[in-house]
C-alpha cells in the first residue's frame, strides 16, 4: 500500500499562474542513465533524481521487492499480508472467499499474542479465522495446516457439538469464541505471497506508458458538453492528443465516433487549446476536411480506411467520449526509510507549523509564497487541512510580491511523519501538484521558489486520517421472485434500505448522511433528477406516485461526519436499478359482491367508484366502461365472465344481449323491467390504453316488495387479495333509509356458498357484529386460508323486511412457512457481558425470500405452562439471515428469575408468518458489589456503550443502538433496586442522563426505530429517584418529537394503525415514568425556588401536549363503534375511541376502574347542544393521571393532591356542553384511599371512640367514607353509628351498623369500610366506633385493639376557565359513589388542557394538632373536596360502658 501518490500537473493544465517574473530553468537531467529498477519512473531534480517505485518495490532505485496489494494490509512484524473481508459469510464460504483471492490466501492462522493484537486492531466486527474442530470434536486445527501454538479463548469459553468454528471479537480481551459454523460473519484472510506491481490507473481506465496518462472510454454517449461533464466528474477531461502515437493509441480503443477535447465554439475556425488547457500542437484532419458553421466540436471515428482522421460534428450530436487524466505514479510503502531520494534525508521528527521563509538574513520581506490545499476535483478546502486516505489533493503555490525567480518551477518537498520518522520526497513542477496519500499520517508539504539572490519557502501540514466507510450496499423491498431491475407499481410506496460498514479504526463520534437520488433520462439524453432526499437512517421511502413509468438509476451517496466539527470522515456512492410500471385498473361496483333488491323500486348498478390507482383521488381516471349481464342460478358462483357466458345464454333483459348497450359508469333499470326471484349477474370491464384492464362482478337477487338497500364498502385492505396480516375494515349502509326516522339494525356473519355459517367472528372483531362498521383483527383468516374465497354478509333489518349485501374475501393460497426451530445460545448469561445468538433452521416456504423478525419481551408471564410476553415487545432484528449474533439482551426482571422471552416471526414475501418462542435468562453483569469499583465499572460500561452507540448511529443503525441503551438501562434498574447509597444513585443518575442524550440523538424516520427508541427511553427513565429535572425535560421533549412523528403517520385504517397504537403504548409508559419522576422532584422542591417550579411547569406543559398528540394519533385511525384503545400505566392511563354522531346519545365510554368512564345523556338533550357541530363522527378521549400535575402557584390547584381525569369530545371541532337539561354521568377512580397517614386508635371491650364533625365545612350532599384497618386483631367485628355526643353522655342517633370480617383475604389492606350519608351525619354530632357485641362475636385475644382510621368525603370539581379556578358549580356527587369510585353528575363539559378535567378527592391528609380535649384527643384536618374540613376525632378510655364525653371543635 502506497503512502502517497504524486500526479505531476503543469501550470497550463490547471490554469494557475505564478505571480512575479519567470526565469529560465537550468536543471541538470540525471535520468538519462535510467537508474530506476523494476519499472520505477525517474524524475529529474536540481542535480539529483527521484525514483517513483511501482507497488511492491522500495529502495532509492526501487531495488527491493516487498508489500501487499490494496486493500490487503501488511504485517511487517510477521511478514504476511492480511485482508479483512467485510462481507458476511458462513465459515465454509469465508474460507472459499479467501482461497479465491489467489496468491496462496487462506483463512487466517494466528500464532502469537502480537499477531492476535495486530489482527484485532484491523477489524470492526466479529470475524472468522481459520481455526475449527470440525474434524474431531475438541481437537483444533488451522485451515492452512500451520500448527496450533497459540490460543486466546476466555476462561469461561463455552463449547458444544454445534459450535465448532472460531471467530475473533473486536473490543474484547481474550477475544476468541466458538460459534455454529453456519453463522454469517466477516472474516480475516492471510497470504504469504508478495504481489506484483500495478499500472497506477483505476479500474476500467487504460494506461498508456508512452504518455503516462490513463484513458477511459465512456460508452453511454451524449452531447459534447455532457461528455466533458462526465470526464470532469471523474477527475479528468476530454482527451487531448499531442502526437501520432497517442492518436493511434486512442484510435485502437474505439468502436465508433468519440468526442475529443477540442472545439472552435468561441471563434469559428480557431482552436488553439484543448479543453484541458494544453496547446493544440497536433491534429489529424483529412486534407479535404470541410467544416459546416454548425459543426464546432471535434471527434475521432474508428474506421479502417480513415487513417485515424478527426472530424467536426454538431456539438449537440450524441457521441461517446474519451476521458484522459494523469497516470498515478505510486511511491512505495515499506518501513520508515520509505521515500528515499539521492538527497540526504531529513532527520527531524518535529512537525513544523505552516510558515513562509526566505533564505537571506538581511533582506526586507517584500515577497512571499502561499500554499493552498484543496480537495480535487471540486477544489474545495478542507477543515484544518484534514484529509482522508486516498483523497486527491490539489496543492498550489502562489508567489506574491517582487521576486526574481531563477525558474518558473517550484521545488516541492513532502515530509512524512509516520511513526515519528521524517523522510522527504522531492519533485519539481510548476505551481501545482496533485497528491494522493494512501496511508494515515501527518505530512508537511514544502514549496520552494528558487531565486537569483534568495529562495522563498513555505510549508503546510496535511493530516491524513482513515476513510471511515468500508462498504455500502442497498436492498429494495421487492416482491416475490422480482426481476432485475426490480419492478414496482407506481401506486405503491417503495421502501429502500442500505447497509454500511465502518472502518474499525474510526472511533470518534460520527453521524451519517445518506443522500438518495433517483435519475432517469429524457429522449434528448438529458439526465433528470426524479427523487432526492437526505436521511440520517438507513431507510428511505419513495411515496407512491412519485416516479413516472420507466427504468431508473438509484444512486446512494453515504457520508460520515464528525459530530464535533462536521468534518467528512468517509464517503461512498453506489448505483442500482429499478423499474416503475403501471398497475392494473380496479373495477368496483358499489354495494359489494352481491346484494338484494326489491322489485318495487328502480335498480341502480353503479361502477363510478372504479379507478386507476395511479390517478389521485378526486381526479378523472378516463377509463372506458363495458357492461355485461346474465341471469344465473343463485347457488352457482362463476369465477370469470367467460365461464358465466359459457354456462348460460340468458341475457338479463329481453331487448338486449349479454353485452349491454350502456358504456356509462352507472346503469339504472326501471322497476317494471324487474322480475322477482331472479338473480342477475352484472359484470363490469374497465379499460384504458397502456394498462391492464379491470374486471369485477356483482350478483343481485331480486325479491318482491321494497327492501332496505344494503351496501358494503371496503375501507381498508381492499386489494384483489387481502393481506391476512392486516386488519380488514368494512362499512355497511342503507341507501334508501331515512336515518333520522327509521332505525336499521345490522348483523354480520361469515359464510361460504351463501348459506352455511362457517365461523364465529365475535372474538375476532373490535366492533362487534351488530354495528355498521366491521373491523376484523389481523390474522383472522389464517386458519381458513386454504379455502381461497369466503363471504362476509351483512343483513340490514328494518320493520318487517330484511336486505343484505355480501363482500367476497379472496384469500391467497399462501400457507405460512413450514415450522422450523430457533435456539438462543447461550441460554443463560449476563447483560452486556454475554454475546447472545439466535439461530433458526428448517423454515421453508415456496414464497421466498423469508424474513426473520426477533421481538424481545423483558416481562414474562406463565400461562398454561408456557412463557408469554407481557406488554409491547422490542424489535431486536429484522432481515433475511436465519442466524443473528451480537444481540444485546437486557437484564430480565428479578421477580421473573431474570427470564426474558424472544418471539421469532418468520414470514414469506406474501406476509404469511409462523412464530416460535424461546427464552433465555439474562442476569445483571458481574460487578464489584460495593464502593468505587462498582462506580468505575458502571462508568467504564457507559463509555463502552457510548463508543458503540456512536459507531452504530454513524452507520445508520438506530435499532442496535437502542438495544445497547436499553441493556445498560436495565442494568441500572437492577442495581438501583439493591443499592440505595447516595454515591451510587448519583452515578446512575449521571449515566441515565447520558443515555437519554443518546436516545435523543437517534433520528426517528420509521415506526420501527421510533418504537425501539421510545422503549429504550422507558427503560432508562424507570427509576423516578434517579431522573433529574433536566433529564425529565429532555426525555419529555424527546417523547414529544417522537409523538409528532407518530401523528404524521396517523389517519390510516391499515396495518399502520396497529403500529401507531403499539407506539402509543410505549410512549405512554415513558410519559408515566417522567410524570412519576416529576412528582418525586416536586415533593423535594423548596418553596422559594421559583426557577425549579418554572421548570416543573414547562415539563408538565410538554407532557400534557404529548398526551394530546398520542390520543390524536390513535383516534385518527379509529373506526366508529370500534372497541376503545386503552393504555394503562402506573401514573398515566388513556382511552381513545370513535363513535357515530347519531350513536353518541346514552353512549358509555371509558376503561377499567382505575381509568374511569362517562355516559352521555339522551338524544333530545344533546341535539340542541350539538346543532352547530358538522362532523358525522365523534372522537372520544379520556386521560387519567395519578396525581394532579397542575400544582404550581397560579394553576389554582396547589392544594389539590388527588388524581385527575380529562374528558374530550370532538367532531369537526371541540364539543363543549353548557347547562344541559340532563346530567352527564362521570365515574372517577379513587386511586389512593389509603395513602394518607392514618390515625392510630386503641379500643377495648369496654371502651369506644368517637369522631366529632365540623358540619360547617361539609359538602351539601354526598357521603363520608371511613376505612379502618385492624392492625393487630384482623378477626374483629366493629359497628358504627351516627351519634349525638355531649359532655356527659353519648347515644346513637342512626342505626347501629355492624361490619364483620370473613376468613377470606380482603381485596385491599382495609378490613372495614363504611359509607355514611352526609344527610344522616348532619342529624348528629359525630360517629361512634366500637366492638360489636353479638352471640357469634369472635373471641378477642387482646384487650387493646389497634385501629388505623382513614376518612374522606367526596366532591366533584372541574376547572373553571372563566374564573381560572377549580369549581364545583353544576357538578354534584351522584348516588352510585363508593369508596373506590366517585360518581359525578355534571350538566356541562368544557375545555381545559384540551379536555374537561374532573377531580375526585380521594384521600384524607390528617394533620394532628395540639388541641387538647378531655382525655386523649386529636384534631384532624381532612382534605375533603379540596377544601379543608376539620374533623375532631376524640379518643378516650373511660371506666363505664361506652361512656363518651364530647367537645365540639369550632
From Swiss-Prot:
Task: Give start and end of each REJ domain.
Answer: 468-1187
Record's keyword terms, sorted = Cell membrane, Disulfide bond, EGF-like domain, Glycoprotein, Lectin, Membrane, Receptor, Repeat, Signal, Transmembrane, Transmembrane helix
Domain (GAIN-B) ranges: 1274-1405
Q: Does the keyword Endoplasmic reticulum apply?
A: no
Where are the Cytoplasmic topological domains? 1436-1450
Which residues are reported to be glycosylated?
A: 48, 90, 175, 184, 273, 379, 390, 455, 461, 622, 661, 677, 685, 753, 842, 1311, 1344
Show which residues form the site (Cleavage): 1389-1390
Q: Does this UniProt record's set of keywords contain Transmembrane? A: yes
Localization, per the record, is: Cell membrane
Q: Which cysteines are joined by disulfide bonds?
A: 31-42, 36-51, 53-62, 98-189, 165-181, 231-323, 297-315, 1356-1384, 1371-1386
Membrane-spanning residues where?
A: 1415-1435
Q: What membrane topology was assigned to this protein in its record?
A: Single-pass type I membrane protein
Give ranges for the Extracellular compartment: 27-1414
Query: Listed GO molecular functions?
Result: calcium channel activity; calcium ion binding; carbohydrate binding
The region annotated as signal peptide is 1-26
GPS: annotated segments? 1356-1405
Q: How is it modified after translation?
A: Autoproteolytically processed at the GPS region of the GAIN-B domain; this cleavage modulates receptor activity.
Specify the C-type lectin domain's residue ranges: 77-190, 210-324
GO cellular component, alphabetical, reads: membrane; plasma membrane
Protein family according to the UniProt entry: Belongs to the polycystin family.
Known function:
Receptor for the egg jelly ligands inducing the acrosome reaction. Could be a regulator of sperm ion channels.
- List the protein's name: Sperm receptor for egg jelly
- Specify the species: Strongylocentrotus purpuratus
What's the encoding gene here? Answer: REJ
Amino acid at each position: 500500500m502506497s503512502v502517497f501518490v504524486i500526479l505531476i500537473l503543469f501550470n497550463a493544465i490547471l490554469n494557475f499562474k505564478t505571480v512575479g517574473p519567470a526565469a529560465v530553468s537550468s536543471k541538470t537531467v540525471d535520468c538519462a542513465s535510467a537508474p530506476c529498477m523494476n519499472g520505477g519512473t525517474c524524475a529529474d531534480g536540481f542535480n539529483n533524481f527521484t525514483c517513483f517505485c511501482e507497488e511492491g518495490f522500495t529502495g532509492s532505485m526501487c531495488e527491493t521487492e516487498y508489500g501487499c496489494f490494496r486493500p490487503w494490509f501488511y504485517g511487517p512484524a510477521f511478514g504476511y499480508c492480511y485482508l479483512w473481508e467485510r462481507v458476511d459469510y458462513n465459515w465454509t464460504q469465508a474460507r472459499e472467499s479467501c482461497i479465491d483471492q489467489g496468491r496462496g490466501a487462506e483463512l487466517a492462522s494466528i500464532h502469537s499474542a502480537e499477531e492476535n493484537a495486530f489482527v484485532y486492531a484491523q477489524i470492526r466486527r466479529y470475524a472468522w479465522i481459520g481455526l475449527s474442530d470440525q474434524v474431531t470434536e475438541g481437537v483444533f486445527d488451522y485451515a492452512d495446516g500451520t500448527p496450533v501454538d497459540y490460543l486466546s479463548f476466555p476462561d469461561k469459553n463455552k463449547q458444544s457439538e454445534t459450535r465448532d468454528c472460531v471467530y475473533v471479537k473486536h473490543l474484547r480481551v481474550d477475544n476468541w469464541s466458538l460459534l455454529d459454523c453456519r453463522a454469517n460473519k466477516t472474516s480475516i484472510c492471510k497470504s504469504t505471497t508478495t504481489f506484483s506491481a500495478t499500472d497506477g490507473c483505476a479500474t476500467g481506465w487504460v494506461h498508456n506508458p508512452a504518455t503516462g496518462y490513463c484513458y477511459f472510454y465512456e460508452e453511454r454517449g451524449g452531447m459534447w458538453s455532457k461528455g466533458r461533464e462526465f470526464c470532469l466528474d471523474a477527475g479528468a477531461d476530454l482527451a487531448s492528443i499531442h502526437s501520432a502515437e497517442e492518436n493511434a493509441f486512442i484510435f485502437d480503443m474505439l468502436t465508433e465516433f468519440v468526442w475529443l477535447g477540442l472545439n472552435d465554439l468561441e471563434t469559428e475556425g480557431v482552436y488553439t487549446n484543448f479543453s484541458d488547457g494544453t496547446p493544440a500542437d497536433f491534429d489529424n484532419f483529412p486534407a479535404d476536411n470541410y467544416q459546416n458553421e454548425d459543426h464546432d466540436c471535434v471527434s475521432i471515428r474508428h474506421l479502417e480506411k480513415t487513417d485515424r482522421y478527426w472530424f467536426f460534428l454538431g456539438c449537440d450530436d450524441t457521441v461517446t467520449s474519451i476521458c484522459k487524466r494523469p497516470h498515478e505514479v505510486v511511491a512505495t510503502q515499506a518501513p520508515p526509510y520509505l521515500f528515499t531520494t539521492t538527497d540526504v534525508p531529513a532527520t527531524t521528527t518535529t512537525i513544523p507549523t505552516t510558515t513562509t521563509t526566505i533564505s537571506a538574513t538581511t533582506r526586507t520581506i517584500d515577497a512571499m509564497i502561499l500554499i493552498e490545499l484543496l480537495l480535487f476535483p471540486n477544489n474545495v478546502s478542507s477543515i484544518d487541512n484534514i484529509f482522508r486516505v486516498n483523497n486527491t489533493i490539489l496543492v498550489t503555490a502562489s508567489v506574491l510580491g517582487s521576486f526574481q525567480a531563477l525558474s518558473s518551477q517550484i521545488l516541492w518537498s513532502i515530509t512524512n511523519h509516520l511513526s515519528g520518522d521524517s523522510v522527504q520526497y522531492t519533485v519539481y513542477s510548476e505551481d501545482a501538484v496533485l497528491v494522493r496519500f494512501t496511508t494515515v499520517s501527518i505530512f508537511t508539504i514544502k514549496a520552494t521558489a528558487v531565486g537569483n539572490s534568495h529562495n522563498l519557502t513555505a510549508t503546510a501540514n496535511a493530516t491524513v486520517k482513515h476513510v471511515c466507510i468500508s462498504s455500502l450496499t442497498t436492498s429494495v423491498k421487492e416482491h416475490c421472485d422480482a426481476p432485475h431491475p426490480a419492478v414496482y407499481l407506481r401506486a405503491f410506496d417503495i421502501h429502500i434500505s442500505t447497509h454500511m460498514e465502518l472502518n474499525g479504526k474510526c472511533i470518534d463520534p460520527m453521524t451519517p448522511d445518506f443522500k438518495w437520488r433517483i435519475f432517469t433520462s429524457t429522449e434528448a439524453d438529458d439526465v433528470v433528477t426524479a427523487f432526492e432526499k437526505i436521511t440520517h437512517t438507513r431507510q428511505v421511502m419513495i411515496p407512491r406516485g412519485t416516479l413516472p413509468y420507466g427504468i431508473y438509476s438509484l444512486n446512494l451517496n453515504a457520508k460520515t461526519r464528525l459530530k464535533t466539527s462536521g468534518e467528512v470522515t468517509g464517503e461512498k456512492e453506489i448505483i442500482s436499478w429499478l423499474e416503475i410500471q403501471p398497475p392494473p385498473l380496479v373495477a368496483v361496483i358499489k354495494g359489494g359482491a352481491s346484494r338484494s333488491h326489491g322489485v318495487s323500486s328502480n335498480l341502480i348498478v353503479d361502477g363510478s367508484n372504479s379507478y386507476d390507482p395511479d390517478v389521485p383521488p378526486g381526479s378523472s381516471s378516463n377509463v372506458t366502461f363495458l357492461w355485461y349481464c346474465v341471469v344465473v342460478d343463485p347457488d352457482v358462483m362463476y369465477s370469470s365472465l367467460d365461464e358465466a357466458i359459457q354456462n348460460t345464454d340468458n341475457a338479463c333483459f329481453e331487448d338486449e344481449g349479454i353485452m349491454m348497450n350502456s358504456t356509462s359508469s352507472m346503469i339504472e333499470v326501471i322497476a317494471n323491467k324487474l322480475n322477482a326471484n331472479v338473480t342477475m349477474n352484472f359484470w363490469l370491464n374497465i379499460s384504458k390504453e397502456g394498462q391492464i384492464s379491470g374486471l369485477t362482478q356483482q350478483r343481485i337477487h331480486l325479491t318482491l316488495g321494497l327492501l332496505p338497500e344494503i351496501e358494503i364498502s371496503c375501507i381498508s385492505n381492499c386489494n384483489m387479495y387481502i393481506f391476512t396480516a392486516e386488519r380488514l375494515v368494512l362499512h355497511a349502509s342503507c341507501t334508501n333509509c331515512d336515518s333520522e326516522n327509521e332505525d336499521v339494525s345490522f348483523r354480520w356473519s361469515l359464510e361460504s356458498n351463501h348459506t352455511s355459517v362457517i365461523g364465529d367472528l365475535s372474538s375476532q372483531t373490535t366492533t362487534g357484529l351488530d354495528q355498521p362498521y366491521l373491523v376484523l383483527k389481523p390474522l383472522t383468516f389464517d386458519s381458513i386460508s386454504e379455502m381461497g374465497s369466503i363471504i362476509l354478509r351483512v343483513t340490514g333489518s328494518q320493520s318487517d323486511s330484511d336486505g343484505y349485501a355480501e363482500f367476497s374475501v379472496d384469500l391467497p393460497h399462501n400457507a405460512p412457512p413450514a415450522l422450523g426451530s430457533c435456539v438462543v445460545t447461550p441460554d443463560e448469561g449476563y447483560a452486556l457481558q454475554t454475546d447472545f445468538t439466535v439461530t433458526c433452521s428448517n423454515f421453508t416456504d415456496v414464497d421466498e425470500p423469508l424474513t426473520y423478525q426477533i421481538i424481545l419481551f423483558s416481562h414474562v408471564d406463565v400461562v398454561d405452562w408456557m412463557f408469554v410476553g407481557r406488554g409491547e415487545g422490542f424489535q431486536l432484528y429484522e432481515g433475511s439471515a436465519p442466524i443473528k449474533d451480537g444481540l444485546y439482551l437486557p437484564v430480565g426482571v428479578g421477580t421473573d428469575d431474570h427470564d426474558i422471552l424472544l418471539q421469532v416471526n418468520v414470514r414469506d414475501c406474501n406476509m404469511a408468518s409462523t412464530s416460535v418462542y424461546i427464552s433465555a435468562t439474562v442476569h445483571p453483569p458481574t460487578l464489584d458489589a460495593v464502593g468505587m469499583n462498582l462506580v468505575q465499572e458502571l462508568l467504564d460500561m457507559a463509555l463502552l456503550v457510548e463508543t458503540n452507540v456512536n459507531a452504530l448511529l454513524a452507520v445508520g443503525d438506530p435499532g442496535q443502538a437502542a438495544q445497547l441503551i436499553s441493556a445498560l438501562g436495565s442494568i441500572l434498574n437492577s442495581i438501583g433496586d439493591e443499592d440505595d447509597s447516595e454515591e451510587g444513585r448519583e452515578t446512575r443518575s449521571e449515566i441515565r442522563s447520558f443515555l437519554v442524550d443518546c436516545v435523543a440523538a437517534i433520528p426517528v424516520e420509521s415506526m420501527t426505530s421510533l418504537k425501539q427508541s421510545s422503549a429504550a427511553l422507558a427503560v432508562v427513565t424507570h427509576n423516578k429517584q434517579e431522573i433529574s429535572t433536566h433529564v425529565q425535560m429532555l426525555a419529555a421533549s424527546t417523547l414529544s418529537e417522537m409523538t409528532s412523528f407518530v401523528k404524521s403517520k396517523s389517519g390510516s385504517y391499515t396495518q399502520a394503525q396497529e403500529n401507531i397504537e403499539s407506539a402509543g403504548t410505549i410512549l405512554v409508559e415513558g410519559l408515566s415514568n417522567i410524570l412519576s419522576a416529576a412528582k418525586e422532584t416536586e415533593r423535594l422542591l423548596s418553596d422559594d425556588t421559583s426557577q425549579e417550579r418554572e421548570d416543573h411547569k414547562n415539563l408538565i406543559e410538554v407532557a400534557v401536549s404529548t398526551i394530546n398528540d398520542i390520543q390524536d394519533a390513535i383516534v385518527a385511525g379509529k373506526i366508529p363503534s370500534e372497541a376503545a384503545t386503552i393504555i394503562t400505566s402506573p401514573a398515566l392511563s388513556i382511552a381513545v375511541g370513535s363513535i357515530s354522531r347519531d350513536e353518541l346519545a346514552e353512549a358509555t365510554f371509558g376503561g377499567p376502574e382505575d381509568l374511569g368512564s362517562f355516559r352521555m345523556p339522551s338524544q333530545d338533550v344533546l341535539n340542541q347542544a350539538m346543532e352547530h357541530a358538522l362532523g358525522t363522527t365523534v372522537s372520544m378521549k379520556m386521560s387519567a393521571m395519578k396525581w394532579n400535575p397542575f400544582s404550581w402557584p397560579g394553576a389554582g390547584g396547589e392544594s389539590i393532591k388527588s388524581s385527575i381525569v380529562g374528558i374530550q369530545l370532538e367532531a369537526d371541532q371541540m364539543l363543549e356542553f353548557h347547562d344541559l337539561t340532563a346530567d352527564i354521568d362521570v365515574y372517577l377512580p379513587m386511586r389512593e384511599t389509603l395513602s394518607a397517614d392514618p390515625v392510630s386508635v386503641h379500643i377495648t371491650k369496654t371502651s369506644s371512640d368517637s369522631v366529632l364533625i365540623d358540619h360547617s365545612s361539609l359538602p351539601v350532599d354526598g357521603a363520608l367514607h371511613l376505612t379502618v384497618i385492624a392492625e393487630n386483631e384482623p378477626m374483629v367485628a366493629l359497628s358504627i353509628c351516627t351519634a349525638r355526643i355531649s359532655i356527659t353522655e353519648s347515644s346513637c342517633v342512626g342505626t347501629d351498623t355492624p361490619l364483620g370480617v370473613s376468613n377470606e383475604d380482603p381485596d385491599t389492606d382495609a378490613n372495614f369500610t363504611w359509607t355514611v350519608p352526609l344527610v344522616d351525619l348532619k342529624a348528629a354530632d359525630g360517629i361512634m366506633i366500637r366492638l360489636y357485641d353479638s352471640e357469634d362475636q369472635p373471641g378477642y385475644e387482646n384487650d387493646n385493639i389497634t385501629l388505623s382510621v382513614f376518612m374522606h368525603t367526596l366532591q366533584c370539581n372541574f376547572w373553571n376557565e372563566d374564573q381560572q379556578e377549580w369549581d364545583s358549580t353544576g357538578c354534584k356527587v351522584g348516588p352510585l359513589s363508593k369508596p373506590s369510585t366517585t360518581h359525578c353528575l355534571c350538566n356541562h363539559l368544557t375545555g381545559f388542557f384540551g379536555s374537561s378535567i374532573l377531580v375526585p378527592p380521594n384521600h384524607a391528609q390528617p394533620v394532628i394538632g395540639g388541641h387538647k380535649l378531655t382525655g386523649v384527643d386529636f384534631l384532624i384536618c381532612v382534605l375533603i373536596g379540596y377544601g379543608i374540613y376539620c374533623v375532631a376525632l376524640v379518643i378516650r378510655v373511660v371506666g363505664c360502658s361506652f361512656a363518651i364525653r364530647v367537645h365540639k371543635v369550632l
